[in-house]
Design a protein with these regions (language model features):
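Formylglycine-dependent sulfatase
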Residues: 1-180
């Protein structure tokens, strides 16, 4: 955006599942080449003494975005695909912190922190009742949960991306498919 303050550095925070310390070339990996990540590491900040608050997806993401230990907050274990939004809009997030410092914020990729106000009550055929815009993100293009949990859709700014009303989405973790 040409109206943004360009005196501040860009911040790109990459959060990956199952990526070990020795899996990237910039940390000593020999069997895989990661030239783009190497460049980010050489031109930015490369952490050499960082620790995860949890070993799995949902709780580690929760802690990273809120600054709270997930193990102290009930309901922050690995989220089901139809989980309601675990981080509540009134909670202060990393996105809120960046926005208050004048940054534009965005989230991209795997979310896995729930969407909508309540578990199993999302209407995937309409704008979601609670999404990343409520947590300080100006823009989002995310996968709702994981590739092995329905709905396997991308969500852009609180709505299913490329939604086709002639093919409505129904998600149930209780009802079987016809014929099952």
């Amino acid at each position: 955006n040409k109206n943004q303050n360009t005196d501040k550095p860009n911040v790109i925070f990459i959060y990956a599942d199952d990526l070990g310390y020795g899996d990237l070339e910039c940390y000593g990996a020999k069997n895989v080449q990661t030239p783009n990540v190497n460049r980010l590491a050489s031109e930015g900040i490369r952490f050499i003494n960082a620790h995860a608050t949890a070993a799995t997806s949902t709780p580690s993401r929760y802690s990273m975005l809120t600054g709270e230990y997930a193990w102290r907050k009930p309901g922050t274990d690995v989220a089901a695909g139809n989980a309601g939004m675990i981080i509540r809009p009134e909670q202060y997030t990393m996105a809120d912190m960046f926005k208050s410092s004048g940054y534009a914020t965005g989230a991209f990729g795997k979310w896995h922190l729930g969407l909508g106000d309540k578990t199993a009550q999302q209407d995937w055929n309409a704008p979601l009742s609670a999404s990343l815009g409520d947590l300080g993100f100006d823009y989002s293009y995310i996968m709702a949960a994981t590739a092995d949990r329905v709905p396997c859709v991308f969500i852009e700014n609180g709505q299913v991306a490329n939604y086709d009303p002639s093919a409505p989405i129904e998600v149930s973790y209780i009802k079987n498919f016809p014929g099952e």
